[in-house]
Amino acid sequence: MGTPRLPDKRWSIDLEKKIQEEHYADKSAYQNRYGFKPESGKELFVIDTPPPYPSGTWHIGAVAQYSMIDVLARSQRLLGKEVYFPWGVDRNGINIEFTVEKNTKRKMKTYDREEFLDLCRETIEAFTQAMRKTAARVGLSCDFAAEYLTDAPDYRAVTQAIFVELFKKGDIVEDLRPNIYDPVE
């Protein structure tokens, strides 16, 4: 019987940090392991999920959800498939505006437009960095090198082009329908 590689079975945060640092230290090895290589000739397995929205600290429910998705990605890699598991962040929405208002204790209407947008950008960037760090610390095997942000000009151009194409085909319609909404500002 072989000797255990970790004779001391107690876990420490320092040991965890060391393992994580080694895991991410060689960027080319990480990219080779988890990066998407469509020209590999392997059967493709594409994971398409709505990207998480950073409106604060990434909570345990979101971490659990992405951990389950990660299990699928890893299992498909073990089955020999080329897995596309992109890392993206949804950086559009009203929640960040509410967060800025809450943090500054000022309503959006009291700001100059550019000043408020700058505060929103700073806040969303801080939350994005924290979420990216948490995702890496959890050990998600997504393709961080191919990160996409929904407020990036290239991302917006693609989504707008798709919207225009669908509109021209008649797949987008205007209609009156009942909807649930929150009347509180």
PLM region spans:
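N-terminal, positively charged nucleic-acid-binding surface of large information/translation enzymes
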Residues: 1-185
